[in-house]
Amino acid sequence: MARVTVQDAVEKIGNRFDLILTAARRARQLQLNQSVPLVPEDNDKPTVIALREIEKGLINQDIMDAQEFQKMAKVQETEEAAVALITE
């Protein structure tokens, strides 16, 4: 079982409540295979991987928001292209 100390992660995020929200959001992305881990998995669960990514400064709320915005923009662009093809 992996032992993770969250003190470094708390310092990266700001407070423990935001850490919980950020780690849960990232763990959900990893669990649903919506994103690839940024650290070696080492047979760890998604929550542990998320905490390790946060601790190393690879993930935070702003980064996840930017990634989500890019995905939504890409989907919107694809939908607009499909509508343009239909209306031609």
From Swiss-Prot:
Annotated GO biological process: DNA-templated transcription
Enzyme Commission number(s): 2.7.7.6
Superkingdom of the organism of origin: Bacteria
Gene Ontology cellular-component terms listed: DNA-directed RNA polymerase complex
Gene3D superfamilies listed in its UniProt record: 3.90.940.10
SMART domains xref list: RNA_pol_Rpb6
One Pfam family linked to the record: RNA_pol_Rpb6
Keywords: DNA-directed RNA polymerase, Nucleotidyltransferase, Transcription, Transferase
One GO MF term attached to the UniProt entry: DNA binding
Reaction(s) the record says it catalyses: RNA(n) + a ribonucleoside 5'-triphosphate = RNA(n+1) + diphosphate
Subunit structure comment from the entry: The RNAP catalytic core consists of 2 alpha, 1 beta, 1 beta' and 1 omega subunit. When a sigma factor is associated with the core the holoenzyme is formed, which can initiate transcription.
Function: Promotes RNA polymerase assembly. Latches the N- and C-terminal regions of the beta' subunit thereby facilitating its interaction with the beta and alpha subunits.
Protein name in UniProt: DNA-directed RNA polymerase subunit omega
Species: Haemophilus influenzae (strain PittEE)
Species lineage: Bacteria, Pseudomonadati, Pseudomonadota, Gammaproteobacteria, Pasteurellales
